[in-house]
């Protein structure tokens, strides 16, 4: 679903373990890592889409996770011009996302799999909460920062998770 401004409705998933680390997934055929995310289908709520994407991309069911928080507003990013498909209608110039923070207890990590439906990832790892800010593709970095900052208070193990400075784009984790 693309809105009147050209932004595709989408959900992003930050899946945290009980140590406050987050699941960081590698896209098939690329040296690109990101959080699971995906589009909202017509008739779906963001929550419905999040659970569908959780199953399709990571192989987890709602019973495997606890929902901790959701971003209050839509977070938007624009695609660089080279990624915009100008022959497509309606024209999509970026994504607007609702971000979900989920907790996955250790026993349920055994259910993570990438062979459900059309696989998008082929590897994953647990990383520190702020690590993705220094690794994600540049045009998603602002949305990742806003989502992580908004959701960190809801992470049970937030002690010691310092919010990085806004202007520090060479983050070391």
From Swiss-Prot:
This is RNA pyrophosphohydrolase. Signal peptide: none annotated. Keywords: Hydrolase. Its EC number is 3.6.1.-. InterPro entries: Nudix_hydrolase, NUDIX_hydrolase-like_dom_sf, NUDIX_hydrolase_CS, NUDIX_hydrolase_dom, RppH. GO terms for molecular function: pyrophosphatase activity. It is an enzyme of class 3 (hydrolase). A motif (Nudix box) lies at residues 38-59.
